[in-house]
Design a protein with these regions (language model features):
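Hydrophobic, ordered structural segments
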Residues: 5-6, 10, 24, 28, ...
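Hydrophobic alpha-helical membrane-insertion segments
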Residues: 18-25, 98-112, 190-207
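Alpha-helical transmembrane segments of multi-pass membrane proteins
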Residues: 19-39
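Peri-membrane helix termini and adjoining interfacial loops of integral membrane proteins
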Residues: 34-44, 119-132, 171-175, 213-223
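Short, membrane-exposed interhelical loops at transmembrane-helix boundaries
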Residues: 43-50, 134-137, 215-236
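Cytoplasmic juxtamembrane regions at transmembrane-helix boundaries
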Residues: 77-98, 165-189, 256-270
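Glycine/small-residue-rich hydrophobic helix-like segments
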Residues: 186-229
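A cross-kingdom marker for long, charged
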Residues: 235-255, 259-270
Length: 270
């Protein structure tokens, strides 16, 4: 199997793992909307697989998939196999690939530790605690406020990009008939819209933490879902967003099968 074949396979496993995680996030968030409780972020959802039948096998596959996905995204950022333009839009997209790669490195590590029983499955939203802890560390550094504001603004920018993707709903990165069938476009459209809203809320949390110099205001996916639950008509709002996140998971499974994967070996690998 060539390097390109391996990277394509790992990327597809990564899309499938992401799909599984988002479907579970949506399912648990819908349960919270109806019955109360605290929603889970992606690391919390991985913890629920520990006690599932063949859970450690699933976690091992997720770890492999997330690691492969991370390498693919980081390679995209370095080698630019899509031949993106060198303008601001192209640079922003490559930066997004790099950030996505880093995020999936942390998910691969979390899934790997759980698969090897090296960490506890307890705790519903470790991502929220880590957001608070690294925000506290950042605010203690010179220029930390400005950096945290920039990170929050980055989340807003990603939210806008995902919102635009939901609105246009072209999804021309999928193989097969173009444009994609209407039902696929609607799955992707609703999924990306829900994800855009979550990213915008996380961005606001980070900017608020920076401007108020209060790391407790920072939060991740779990806190964003709790914020929706606390709003007027929160049950309805969270239910809709939960369904949207589950649809994003379904769209990721579609991508695992049909997405065109652009791969280029970094020069330093020979």
């Amino acid at each position: 199997m060539t390097y390109n074949d391996r990277m394509t396979l790992f990327a597809r496993i990564g899309f499938a793992a992401r799909g599984l995680v988002y479907i579970l996030i949506g399912w648990f968030a819908l349960d919270v909307a109806i019955h109360g409780g605290r929603p889970m972020d992606n690391q919390g959802v991985l913890g629920t697989l520990v006690d599932a039948p063949l859970g450690h096998v699933l976690l091992g596959i997720c770890a492999l998939g997330f690691a492969g996905y991370a390498i693919w995204r980081l390679t995209e950022a370095i080698t630019d196999p899509e031949r993106l333009s060198n303008d601001m839009k192209g640079r922003f997209k490559r930066a997004g690939h790099a950030v996505s790669g880093i995020v999936h490195v942390t998910l691969a590590m979390a899934a790997g530790r759980l698969a090897l029983r090296q960490t506890s499955a307890q705790g519903s939203s470790p991502g929220d605690r880590s957001a608070e802890s690294w925000s506290a560390w950042l605010l203690a550094q010179p220029g930390g406020v400005a950096i945290l504001v920039a990170v929050g603004a980055g989340f807003f920018a990603v939210a806008v990009a995902q919102g635009i993707k939901a609105y246009k709903a072209r999804f021309d990165e999928l193989d097969g008939r173009i444009p994609a069938p209407d039902y696929v476009r609607w799955i992707g459209r609703l999924g990306y819209a829900a994800r855009a809203l979550i990213f915008a809320i996380i961005g606001w949390f980070l900017i608020s933490a920076a401007l108020n110099h209060d790391p407790d205001r920072a939060g991740g996916l779990g806190e964003a879902l709790m914020e929706l639950r606390a709003q007027p008509e929160g049950v309805l709002v969270l239910s809709v967003v939960a369904c949207g996140l589950a649809l994003f998971g379904m769209f990721s499974l579609i991508e695992a099968r049909y997405r065109r994967i652009s791969v280029a070996k970094p020069g330093f690998l020979g």
